[in-house]
Every structure is written in C-alpha cells, then in structure tokens.
C-alpha cells in the first residue's frame, strides 16, 4: 500500500491521489492501487519554519528560534509518517515540495522509504534533458527558500528560478493559489 502524507496544501494531496488513480487506471475497482491518504492539515507552516538565514540543508538551524520551529514541523511530519508506517504502507509520498526540506531527518527516523520528490524530478530531467540545459523551476517562496532542488540540479543543470533581483509577484504565488 502507498502512504500519502498530505495536508500541506490539501489540494496538492488530493490532486496527487487523482493522478495516481488516473495513471494506474484499472478495468475494475480491484485493479486500482491501494493507498492511504493522511490529510494532516495541522502541520505547522513550513515556510515560516525555515530560518531566514538558512540557505541549504546543511545549515538548518541557524538560531534558536529557527531550530524550535524546524523541530516543531519535523515532529508533526514524523507523526504523520509513523502513522502511515504503522498502517503497513510500503513507502511514503509527500506531495509538498517544501516539506522535502525535512526529508533527511524524516527518513532517518522511519523504517520505510520516503520518495524524494526533488530527486525524482532530477532523475526525470536527467533522462529527458541534456546536461547543462536550462531548466525552469516554478515553485512557492517556501520551496525556493529551502533550496531542495538546488541540491540536485546545481552541478549538472542551469536551474532558472526567481531571485531577489527579479520581480516574483504572480510567478511565485501562482502554485499557492486555489484552482
């Protein structure tokens, strides 16, 4: 069974479930994939829990306040992952890019794999795009702040994303807007 930790953008979790069903369409109900969606919408805000001085995963807790916020989100995400693990899920998917900022710490604390979404996007890109290609990243401010995609793309691709010297207005807010 697939475990889906949603609620960090409830629509994102539901959209993932819909795509999972459409892409794995069975002829009868019993041929659809088994999955358990935990819509854990009470996880503290991820963007607010990333230290303002934090630039990458190796510098997660730059000050006491950032560390407290980081740990609060980690505990909440971990509770969700543990519930999915307890319910016999074989692996976990988290359809929230920003939540992957906590990926390494989460994976260390549970016994089933968590699919690393930025890593999977990188593998897809590597398979379909030439090395050193320009690749655009449409993402929320929280995802951009975490740098979770930089960790994979920086050495092999020219990752194009909004920066402080370019206006971000509608471009960055778009992924957060209701459809």
Language-model regions, residue ranges each:
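Non-catalytic structural scaffold of enzyme domains
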Residues: 1-179
